[in-house]
Structures are given as structure tokens and as C-alpha cells.
Amino acid sequence: MKFSLARTTQAAENLLRAVGPGFSPDANDAQSGGALDPEVCFFRTNRLFRRFRPSLAAATVAFLLLLPSAAQTTTYTPPTPEPVAPAAQQKPPGGKVIFSRSTDENGQTTTQTSPQAGPAAAPPAVQMANAPTAEDAERQAVTFTDFDLDVRLRTAEQHIAVRALLTVRNDGNTPLAHIPLQISSSLNWERIRVNVKDVAFPVATLNSDADHTGQLHEAAVLLAQPLAPGASLQLDVTYSGSIAPSAQRLLAIGTPEDVALHSDWDRIGVDFTGLRGFGNVVWYPVSSVPVILGDGARLFDEIGEHKLRLAGARFRLRLTVEFPHGHAPSVALINGHLAPLTVTDAGGLDEEVAGVATAGDGGETLGFEAPSLFVAIRTPRTGANTMIWVLPDDEAAVQDWTAAAATVTPFLQGWLGQRPRSQLTLLDLPDAQDAPYETGSMLATAIRPAGAEQLEGILAHALTHAWMESPRAWLSEGVAHFMGTLWIEKQRGREQALGTLEAARSALALAEPESPGQGVGQPLADAISPVYYRTKATYVLWMLRDVAGDPTLSAALRAYDPAADVSLGYSRDTGPSSFEKLLEQAGTRRDLSWFFADWVNADKGLPDLSIASVFPSPATAGEWLVTVNVANNGYASAEVPVTVRSGSNSVTQRVQVPARGKAAQRLLILGKPFEVQVNDGTIPETQASVHVTRLDQAAGDSPAATQP
């Protein structure tokens, strides 16, 4: 099937919006238990003094990418493990090694089991499937609640090897006879164990654009006993392979190669490793429904669903990086957080001798995010609440970025508090055209010279994450977008800020259900689509600003505690959210339950407002009393600004208009009124967000109202 350039370019832009930074318009322009025991960890023989060997990884990836894309499934044969005698002169650093990994003379990965671990038993051969074993219902039933990863990178060979302890839960309604696990098609499953026993797992290749290769390798883990609904299971899995730049999914729909590669830049390399996770490159095990680009918004919804299902999961990662002599990485970021590196480089020896760097994250609870991993050779530079990891060629641009951060910081402090919860980390991407990526308080982007206005717009959004790193997408992204629009208001005026909101309203109106009977939509608390947790959330915060007032909203944002919010859980049945309580406590203790019920905890669509009628009448001393009747044909209630204007004055009051109902507001104004306006653009509607009625000027005329 042929696609036009316009359509493929649009698909690429949609992908960027779904998995990219979600900046303001300016930016778009420029378990506690169950951890891996030390006695069952990886150990790589001769890891410090092993010479690098040529790798066949690139050929493997090329072969996989040439597989017919029309086929639903294909099969592969993973590398055959060969026993390797351990080096006699080297002892493992502590503990009992029961599993080791090394590279043979041909650059192939080999594994072995230590004699101390008991009788060696080879894992069962991988079964090659002609069709997938799992069904979509089974894939959707699997929820990951714990990741414990031991990740080994050989950057010169673009190679990754992973051993992971995974805890999964059956969130379906029926028992699961097998567990579907998926990784990128450039990676190969090697071994899967359940209850310390090797299990068989047929492997199929699925067409899915959740990975940059356009395919996933799915292992269907056979269980001795079905996993009951609500029950959990731990799996011990091993896999490896190479991750090179690939834009196969975009090339398949006709996207120009240079555009595609600047969007899908994930790779493992000596100078830069960037693995953005599900939606870009599936470097950790997942269970997802296969989806492709061009099928409406299904891919982007699946990306959001993946992030939502991971929220609350525990995540630990230990990282080992083997690098060529003299090319030690200087920065590692796990899920956007800096992970201090310990580097051992054998100075003075042969240049082909590998060095080793190690890092770990200590464990965290995931929010609405896809786990990511970055390792790079960069130089650190500091700014206001900012750490910039920059390439040598981009040093000249650092001053522009630090100056912009210094300009924006006082504005953010006024709204969010004097001290951020963390620093913003900026990571310089290899190419100036590479698409930016944001996770938490980390922004990967090209550090290039740009105008102050553009950089300030970028950093007003990005720095907000250093203050407000919420596990709730609508707060994390919504507050960042909100602060971006407030910065526009501060610099360019309110009309410009409202114009920014209006530019995104039509997409939101298209996504929203016209009535609750057409579907449940996406409540903000569980939103998976950017148009909800970015656009609608920004509108919600603008409305709360008007309903509660700037001081109250600012106080609630300052008092917000992500850890306390997480303790409430991710279920909608946990009662009022912590943010709702903070708002009610920070102000005059006004009841906001009606607002959160219609705009956050449920998706009732958008209001559909109109001016039903206007009745002006003269009062005393040149004053007029104007009665404005406002109708709402939508299913979401709203508190609406109503403005009456005369020749020399204007008066604005707010009126709460119920869903599918009407409300009347009386306003007293000096001078004869000539215009009535309902809504000022801060409340998103299905058709328009500003309604104006001009009153008849001729004396004695009836108070007719006309919409412009």
C-alpha cells in the first residue's frame, strides 16, 4: 500500500506528539523484597581485560528488518549457548556465581552455569512458533508489578544483555495458562524460569509499531498451573541482542529516511546510548496488544495504556557498561534520574582493552512513564536549578540555556515555591535535528543556540517538572503546560495565552464523547491520551485558577506531595484526590467536589454553552440592571464568566451552569449596556469558547440577542 508524503509526515508528527516531549508551542519549535540476590547475579568473565571482538549483531538486525512485514508471525533461532571455561586467574567479586556470561572469539554471547550451583542443566530449546500462542485478552490481563533488572551493555558492539526478575499479576477475569512476554525484535529470548525451573516458551514475531523495528518477539511462557485472577507470579528471564538505529516502522509507511531516523534515534553506542522504552524501543519485557501506525490513534492509546498499567510498579536496575579504552561514559540516567557512575578504565594498556562502568538506581516506584535508560559521554555544566550535559561542539550554546533558566526561575518560584524537588537535567542529543524527549525532570534535546524567547518558553515547561514531578499524568504534564501558558500570559499578554489554549481545543472537542451514553471517555485521573492529560488538564487548571483564585491554586501546588499522592493508590474508588483536598484546605474551604466529579474523576465531555436571552433595564442614577440567561446543552457543568459592557465600563461575574440546564445572572453596570459575553476562552466547549451578544441600540426595541 502506498502512502502520500503528507500522510506519512503526519504519522511521524503524531508519533512525536505521543512519545515526545509534549512541550509548549515554543518548545516544539526549537520489592523492597525479592531483589536479585548477589549469589544469583550476572558475572562476566575477564570483563576488564577481554578484547573486543567483531559482532554479528548488525547482520542479525538487518536480517530481522528484511522479514516480510505483511506476515503476522515469523520465527527465529536464538544464539546457541556454549560452555566456556572460566579464567583461572580471576575470582568473582564476592558471592557464589551460578550464572556467567562472556563473549567467544567470534563475538557471540555464551553462558555457563557454575558447578557450585548444582548439576548443570541446559535450558530447553526455544520452540519456534508459526503463529502467536497468546490472545489479546491474555496480553491485556498481564500487569507488571515489579522489575528487577541486571543490564549489561557492550557499547562498541551495540549489545545489551539482561537478566530480570519480573513479578506479574493476572488482572483478567479468567486463569492464564501462559504468560505472554514481549521484547524488541532485535533482541532474543534465551532462558525463562518459574519457581527456579526452566520452562518452555514458544516464540513468535508480532508486527507492532510499539518498537522502532516494527516488530516484537513474543514468548508465551507455559505454566504448570494456570495463574488465577488476582494472583501473582515471579519469572526469571534472560535475553540479549543488539540495538542499532532503526526507523523501520516509519520507513514502512513511506516516511523520508532522514525524518524517520531523527524521530527514531534510539540506539546503543560508545558516545551515546538512548533507550526510551515502549513506544520507541522495547528494551524491557512488556505485554501489549500489537498495533501499527496508521490505525487511527490505537498505537498512541496503547502507549498510554502501557504507562498507566505500569504506574505503581517497583523498578530496580543495576547497570554495567563495557566501553573501549579511553571512552568512559560520564553520565547515566535511569528513568530520567541521574545514576552515579563508578568507572574502571585500564589506563596504559592496549587500546582494545575494555573498561567498565557501573551504576544503579536503588529502586523506585514508577509513575505514568515508560522506563528509559541513557548513557553518554558529555561534559556537565550547571545553571539555575539545571544540570546540562553537553557535547564539546555545543559548549557555546550553554550560556543561552542557563540565562533562560535564570530568567524563568523567579516566575516558577512565585507559583510553585522557592526550592524545586530536584534539578532539571538537560542531555544534549547527538544531532541537532533529533526529536526532543522528556521524562520526569529530564529533557533530552539538542543544546543549540536559540533566541531567549524560545528557550524561556521551553524551560518554563521543562523546569516545572523539577518542582512538580507527579506520578499522575494530568498533574505532571498538565501543570507543566499550565505554567507554560502562564509564562506566555506574563510575557505577551492574556489574549496570546488564551489563543494558545484555543489552538488545541478543537482536537480535544473531537476526542471527547458527545454524551456519556457514547462511552466513558477518559477521566483525567486515568487518562492515557496526550489530548486529555495535556490539553484538557491545562484547561482544568485555568478553570481552577478562576474558581479558587491564584493564591489558593499556588498554595495547593506548593503543598502537593507526590509520595502522599501515591499512597492513595491509583484506583478511582479511593475518594477525593490529594490535590482536591489541598485546594479545599488552602482557600476558603469551598466545596469543589462538583468540579472534580465532572472534570477530573469522570469524563462527561465538554459543556455546550449559549446565551439564551438578555434583559437589560434601567435602574437608578444612570445604572442598568442586566439579566443574562445562560444555557448549557452539554453534560459537564461549568462555572462561567459573564461580562456586560457599556460605553465606559465593564462588569464580570461568575455563574455556575449545571449540565443540561440553565442559570441566570444579574449584573449592575454604569451606563447603557451594549454587549454581553459568556466565557472568555478559559472553559473548553464543543463548538466555541467565547459567546457575544450585542444589544439593540434603538430606544424601545425589544432586548433581542444575536450571536456574531
Each predicted region: which residue ranges?
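N-terminal, polar/Ser/Thr-rich
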Residues: Q72-A161, S593-A597
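Acidic/His/Gly-enriched intrinsically disordered linker/tail segments
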Residues: W474-D550, P562-S571
